[in-house]
Structure formats: C-alpha cells, structure tokens
C-alpha cells in the first residue's frame, strides 16, 4: 500500500521531516517514490515551517495513496494557508 508520510532527517534533537510518498512496507527513512514537501517543526524567524506540493499530493491521493494522521493535518494546514 502506498502512503504519504514523514521521513525523519536532521540532527539529534533538531528534527526535520521530508514528506514522502512511499510503499508502507519500506522503512520510515528508507526508499521512497517521490518527495512532495518538507516539515520543519524547529523553524525560527523567517525560516519556512512547511512546504508542500499540493498538486502532487492530490495526484497521489486520487491514485489511492493513504496519508498518515500527521500528514493529513499538515495537508489541512497547507490548504488553509494557501487559501
């Protein structure tokens, strides 16, 4: 099953997440199909907290990809900010 989920990056105590489309059988930080954005929960000042390619997310959801709970909330926030 294809899922849209977070893949952790960054340093210790400084998380940074790539929002990726991946097969659910692959490891969290393992192989992915496509990177559709990022989420930086530790952003400061003018740094971007969230960037998401909503067109690609819509494409993957239309083809049957499931979203994780956290990514679903991030998509909702991105849509609200874009409107």
Swiss-Prot record:
User: Which InterPro entries does the entry mention?
Assistant: Ribosomal_bS16 (IPR000307), Ribosomal_bS16_CS (IPR020592), Ribosomal_bS16_dom_sf (IPR023803)
Gene Ontology MF term list: structural constituent of ribosome
Q: Which biological process terms from the Gene Ontology are attached to this UniProt entry?
A: translation
Q: Name one Pfam family in it.
A: Ribosomal_S16
Give the signal sequence positions. none
Query: What's the domain of life for this entry?
Result: Bacteria
Which keywords has UniProt assigned to this entry? Ribonucleoprotein, Ribosomal protein
Instruction: State any GO CC term.
Output: small ribosomal subunit
Q: Which family does it belong to?
A: Belongs to the bacterial ribosomal protein bS16 family.
Q: Which NCBIfam families match?
A: S16
Q: What is this protein called?
A: Small ribosomal subunit protein bS16
Name of the coding gene: rpsP
């Amino acid at each position: 099953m294809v899922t849209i989920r977070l893949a952790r990056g960054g340093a210790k105590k400084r998380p940074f997440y790539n929002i990726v489309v991946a097969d659910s059988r692959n490891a969290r930080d393992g192989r992915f199909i496509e990177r559709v954005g990022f989420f930086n929960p530790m952003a400061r000042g003018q740094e971007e907290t969230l960037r998401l390619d909503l067109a690609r997310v819509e494409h993957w959801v239309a083809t049957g990809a499931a979203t994780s709970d956290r990514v679903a909330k991030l998509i909702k926030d991105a849509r609200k900010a874009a409107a």
